[in-house]
Amino acid sequence: MWIEIPECYEVLRNVFSKFRRHSLTAAMVKLLMRADTHVSFTVPAEEPVAKCTFSQVLAALSVSLGSMVVGFSSAYTSPALVSMKDRNITSFEVTDQSGSWVGGIMPLAGLVGGILGGPLIEYLGRKNTILATATPFIISWLLIACATHVAMVLVGRALSGFSVGVASLSLPVYLGETVQPEVRGTLGLLPTAFGNIGILLCFVAGNYMDWSELAFLGATLPVPFLILMFLIPETPRWYVSRGRDDRARKALQWLRGKKADVDPELKGIIKSHQDAERHASQSAMLDLLKKTNLKPLLISLGLMFFQQLSGINAVIFYTVQIFQDAGSTIDENLCTIIVGVVNFIATFIATLLIDRLGRKMLLYISDIAMIITLMTLGGFFYVKNNGGDVSHIGWLPLASFVIFVLGFSLGFGPIPWLMMGEILPGKIRGSAASVATAFNWSCTFVVTKTFADIIASIGTHGAFWMFGSVCVVGLVFVIMYVPETQGKSLEDIERKMCGRVRRMSSVANIKPLSFNM
């Protein structure tokens, strides 16, 4: 027996059908009304929905504390460079060039960490790889805090960036493999929320501490993360991949609760692994290039591309100028705090909505908000740079900027990382996540380093219009290619994307919710 809730869906379909005589409208309606575009609200009446356990929350919280260290590391240069440049020591002279490398070396090191992180999570395991990043984080911050030369800061930032690259890959994979489908969206966004807490903490502390004191604070953040990681298990799927089914059962029982029947889920994981093994080649890279695996990998790469080419780093870089053009008298450091607060609030909202609206709906909202605000910012700077009077709309850049950050943090900020841990097949999850993470950091470095050249070539207005145009293409990409994964187990997602339904018919009925992809 099935309970149909969204009657409005059928009403909308009937309304839109009246416009089928218009070919363009019909095409757009067909795309927007695709079954995997929206969340289905049909649930089997006889099957109770599993409840989230404290153990899952503890696991998500533990790894998310690592994300707070990542956020703190990413934001460090913004408040720290000012006090670094004020230090009157010849051996510690921070020029504009060396200062740019203090910030720029982290994404480069993150690229290396992203490449090596894939083999690490397959060889060491998801948990042990995350755990292994804590010590390098502490060492990197102590190097920076005790630095007597710029070179020590650069080494510390490089080590921190490497750890960030490894962590940004392994955190979503761990959560994707441990959290049950019904709450995977909410708990899966905890790393992003804690990452934004780390950013906000760095901005606030940077108002009262110099670069060295701020680095000492950074060295303390991995300690609670390190302690809590010892309390949680390795993922059941990694244990199964190593033939340790008994350990997988214990880990799954800990995560789902002592009274939970984990046999159906464990059998599904084992079946999925066996099926993947039958179709695996001797080379991990050859596995990536298989048609069945290439589709989810390309979708993940596409999401990473549109995340960074939305211009988020460019807009953050231009924060102070936007506030100045808005006629704001707010202190520059306070502006960065406002950015951190907006980031955190938006991500918190996303955690409440993602398991209700689904991934794609939040991506739609996010992309449309970014398109409107980027085009608006471009229009403002076009009028301003051509001698137009913008004094009466000095509030517009500030409003656009806040809405842009809100929109990004609702969807395209956290969801590409969340879906990376969901849609990549289990057999290649480590190597594919490594490729996706390295690609993301490459895009980050390119956008950050070329933004000034883009401004010089096509102007500020042209840069914002360019990023807005990329977001338009990104919206089409989401509509046409990105599947809805809300409420589905990883095995269900893999069967749908890789076309292995027939071989796994005995497991196909193990569904906590019923959805159409």
Swiss-Prot record:
Cytoplasmic side: 1-56, 122-135, 180-184, 234-296, 355-360, 414-437, 483-517
Residues bearing glycans: N88
GO molecular function ontology, one term from the record: trehalose transmembrane transporter activity
Residues passing through the membrane, by range: 57-77, 101-121, 136-156, 159-179, 185-205, 213-233, 297-317, 334-354, 361-381, 393-413, 438-458, 462-482
Reported function: High-capacity facilitative transporter for trehalose. Does not transport maltose, sucrose or lactose. Mediates the bidirectional transfer of trehalose. Responsible for the transport of trehalose synthesized in the fat body and the incorporation of trehalose into other tissues that require a carbon source, thereby regulating trehalose levels in the hemolymph.
Family named by the database record: Belongs to the major facilitator superfamily. Sugar transporter (TC 2.A.1.1) family. Trehalose transporter subfamily.
Protein name per the record: Facilitated trehalose transporter Tret1
